[in-house]
Amino acid sequence: MKRFFSVLVIAISIANYSFAQTTKTVWPVMEKQMKPWVRWWWMGSAVDEKNLSQNLTTYQKAGIGGVEITPIYGAVGYESRYIDFLSPKWMDMLKFTVNKSNSLGLGVDMNTGTGWPFGGPQIKTESAATKLITQKYTVKEGEKLNEPVKVKEAKQEAAKLQALTAYGPKGEILNLLNQVEANGNLNWSPAKGNWEIYALFAGKTRQMVKRAAPGGEGFTLDHLDKNAVKVYLDRFNAAFGNKSQGIRSFFNDSYEVYGANWTPTFFDEFKKNRGYDLRNYLRELVGDNGNKEIIARVKSDYRQTMNDLLLNNFTKPWTSWAHQYKSLTKNQSHGSPGNLLDLYSAVDIPETETFGSSYFPIPGLRRNKEDVRNVNPDPMMSKFASSAAHTTGKKLVSSETFTWLTEHFKTSFSQCKPEAEQLFLSGVNHIFYHGTTNSPSDAVWPGWLFYASVQMNPTNSLWPHIDGLNNYIARCQSVLQAGKADNELLIYWPVYDVWNQAKGLDIALKVHDVDDWLHPTAFYKLATSLSKNGYSFDFASDHLLAQSTVENGLVKTAASASPYKVIIIPQCEMMDLNTFNKVISMASCGATVIFQELPKDVPGLNDLSVRQSQLKTALGKLLFTDLKDGVRQFKTGKGQILLTNDIQKALTYKSIKREELTDAGLQFIRRAING
């Protein structure tokens, strides 16, 4: 029961302190967003006003605060009831749902699509998810290529040749694209030596929308292409009549776009943002150079460009589109091939998820072996979403909760409660159950079901008792949504260490793969150690630090965010030169910056020797003096830079106190109200 007290006792103490000054009521006034919400699957969109009204009323009486509509495939045998997504009849059902929910005091969110990921019939081949296809040829001196330069992969008739680069025996590099004839023949032969030629085609992944609802079937869109995103959203504009539909928030599920590692404008965007022509490095891009350092640097630049494209061509435009309808965006950024912190920060409500069950040292708590996944839900993974909200001053952090917690109808509330509390402790304050299916009254028990759900359904035998769990979550969230996060430490996430790998191409940062990209890192080990020892913190990206300021010795990441006492730079190999210079500048302005180790190198390939020299010069200016306990100090301007392998010793030196309750196995979260 330790985790129960860790949430409840701290929450009550905050509530008493905060509200006693203005009212006799201990708890905040209950609002719908404080209650648990639920993902609400519309199977086949086979809905009608009678059953919608009945189900919404049932949810409201049980203490549910809102629904998140996600249309999916239909139930077999009920095809006559299916309604095509975004058709006039479907829009009538949406309007009825919103109006009925409003009358009941419920909120309505909506998936900006059906199933997952985004895609549908409006996405034709030219707007579909794109992948790069490479082919290698060898040409001898004085000879011509004996085959046309055409894509060999099956079902890639629409693939377009975008680059043809030849590499000579003495390091020569030639761009031969303009020497390819319309029939694919290469009108070129090497004058001396044997040459290797690499062709790059923009092909298509051919991925379809998974679990699509009627009217939502089709190709997955190219999330990296702004024009494709516009094509996708224009279908909604037409259905909505460019008018607000009363949706609180549009939702996007976790990024499960497989193999989409390219877009037709990639070369141009790469050259604009990275400063050199990727066409000259096709050999390195496919990993054939042999120089792993150069390969890793090129691929780091490639991955950073992927991040830029996803952020600027999809996430931000999608959010701007939602705002035009007076709605918010709620996004699961995990799984994306980009900087999760920046992607989460670009939306209104960052959303994490739990998948499978966690181990809790609670005597008698059931955990069946089939419920144990390859990776347990990790609070540090959830902190990527909560950090993005905290550092940008956003109020809500949501979670897709209890996904595959157990098998159908085997989930007890005793298993749900600690999972929810673990989310609260990671900064989540807006829980979405995963979930419930809209089931008609004439469906034979147990009604229509979705396979990955814990079945928060009225047909569940636990439903008569669900108000107890709902009320507990609502009371916790009513406090956790009050005020704002009050974490003291800001920990830099060295994303370039993740990107600087010679293996693979894009790196999808999935919750299921944290053993690969998160757990082995010094960043993760430091964060877990600080958490266990009673310190509270958020994570920071390069972009966040670039726009942060210093006021009275505290770090301000946003006008509406709580300030931070310290910036911590974990041990990292790679650090962007601009980021390094910025944190040094912030120290000069009065901030305290703690390095676990000084960075060793700069990422990327362009102007490498120049940037390495600049980093070396900047590092040479940091003349540290010894303090005590292995802590070294460099004073600069109004602030200071500390250097130590033991971050906790530096925090002790700065008189930043830890919460000693963690010594007893308790956990906590900090909130500030009127402060």
Language-model regions, residue ranges each:
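Bacterial Sec-dependent N-terminal signal peptides
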Residues: 1-23
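Mature N-terminal segment immediately following signal peptide/propeptide cleavage
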Residues: 23-66
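An acidic-aromatic substrate-binding cleft motif
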Residues: 26-42, 201-204, 212, 218-226, ...
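Carbohydrate-binding surfaces of carbohydrate-active enzymes
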Residues: 37, 53, 66, 85-116, ...
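Active-site mouth loops of central-metabolism enzymes
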Residues: 41-50, 221-223, 405-412
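Phosphate/oxyanion-binding active-site loops and adjacent basic polyanion-contact surfaces
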Residues: 48, 220-233, 377-378, 465-469
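Acidic/aromatic-lined carbohydrate-recognition and catalytic surfaces
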Residues: 72-179, 197-199, 209-210, 216-221
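Alpha-amylase-like alpha-glycosidases and glucanotransferases acting on alpha-linked glucans and related
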Residues: 156-159, 163-216, 280-309, 386, ...
